[in-house]
């Protein structure tokens, strides 16, 4: 398989040429001021997993640009590289590892066997263990150290052990039937743990410690914090804490834990929401039926991502459009704008997923690249964001592409009508209006009220945010990031940028540091 930099692709040169030739035909304000605008909106949609669709009508593209993007996908052999990943090739060159998060939700290609272990069977077995354990907890067969029924679960982890699972839980807590309340402790700031512990009944709470290596500094510090509080309250930690870790970590088969569920080195933290890292807390909170629907949606998204036709592959098209915006239009950021309060933490998860994966300046062979790579990712639910940072999005000097997410129905179903419309109708009216406002703008003699428009936007939409659609949404973005890494010739599955700060922090704590670092630390220690 040939792996090459973006600027070495003939198709990238063709894309640059096509954009230059088509620039006058790509102004969104003009596109939406024609008779064909309605047809464009309806036709520029691609099926995703669940009942979701990806609409790109408000992107500055036409047939010529799409043709050039298809050529880029073909030249970079994006689907073939995806197939290599699914078949167990060691795609993570930095750590010499396979990349198997898609295998946690379904098998699309060959069996992946490592050291005699069928990895799909391994993941299914861990899910079976989670199902049996969660059902035993819900039935009262497994009780607290004081013989009580568990009512709450707290996940202790950081990074991918927190952001993804927390975002998924919040996304479903109004929709799924709750069996236990879930909480999360991530920051080593003691106020984070103290706030959670002060809000729950410790005697009826189960704690999940999540650390693949079993050595994560912040997570182990929070574990000690939690254990000290439990012990002060006369509770047996061994009967109220379980571990999610790797089979080779110090936490594995450890009698200090009620039980252990296992992950492996082939699933990166930011890609671990469909592994035991996310499944354990979701199964305890909602039951295994919800987890299975979530995994089903993700598996469907993975399957659709195998299509070579970019007009029929939403994650591939989204990835290519993102590269077009980054490397042709020069956009340095992307805003994730879910018009769903349930997705309030989804932008934070995508921020880690995207920026930790593709925030690189060297290619997969360690050679510096000469082009821009991953954008800055940020976002906030609508309509809240409209009253916060949309001013810059509309009239700022930088053009920032927008990714809207919306649903026809609310999760709870409770709503009222006022001034001729329901709150849900008001929410979605604002979403639709924003897409057009960003695209078409508004001319005004008062320059302070003039909107240039031509702000690119996409829309992911569906009936409702349920477990299956959430899984499909997650898989869409995971696969989008993967494809972009392939296009830029990056290794999207390591994160060396996380390590340097950790190393220096240890030097501070051991008082073995250079003078400048010591001077900074003395402000705070």
Swiss-Prot record:
Q: Active site: which residues?
A: 356 (proton donor), 387, 502
Q: Which InterPro entries match?
A: G6P_Isomerase, G6P_Isomerase_C, Phosphoglucose_isomerase_CS, SIS_dom_sf, SIS_PGI_1, SIS_PGI_2
Can you say where in the cell this protein is located? Cytoplasm
Membrane-spanning residues: none
Q: Which PROSITE patterns match?
A: P_GLUCOSE_ISOMERASE_2 (PS00174), P_GLUCOSE_ISOMERASE_3 (PS51463)
The terms under GO molecular function for this entry are:
carbohydrate derivative binding; glucose-6-phosphate isomerase activity; monosaccharide binding
Q: Which reaction does it catalyse?
A: alpha-D-glucose 6-phosphate = beta-D-fructose 6-phosphate
Looking up Pfam families in the UniProt record yields: PGI (PF00342)
Assigned EC number: 5.3.1.9
Does Cytoplasm count among this protein's keywords? yes
Q: Which UniProt keywords apply?
A: Cytoplasm, Gluconeogenesis, Glycolysis, Isomerase
Pathway field of the UniProt record reads: Carbohydrate biosynthesis; gluconeogenesis; Carbohydrate degradation; glycolysis; D-glyceraldehyde 3-phosphate and glycerone phosphate from D-glucose: step 2/4
Catalytic EC class = isomerase
Give the GO cellular component terms, alphabetically. cytosol
**Taxonomically, which superkingdom?**
Bacteria
Which GO terms are recorded in the biological process aspect for this UniProt protein?
gluconeogenesis; glucose 6-phosphate metabolic process; glycolytic process
Its job:
Catalyzes the reversible isomerization of glucose-6-phosphate to fructose-6-phosphate.
- Similarity comment text for this entry: Belongs to the GPI family.
PANTHER family reported in the protein's UniProt record: GLUCOSE-6-PHOSPHATE ISOMERASE
Q: What is this protein called?
A: Glucose-6-phosphate isomerase
**Organism of provenance:** Treponema denticola (strain ATCC 35405 / DSM 14222 / CIP 103919 / JCM 8153 / KCTC 15104)
Instruction: Write the lineage as a comma-separated list.
Output: Bacteria, Pseudomonadati, Spirochaetota, Spirochaetia, Spirochaetales
Gene symbol? pgi
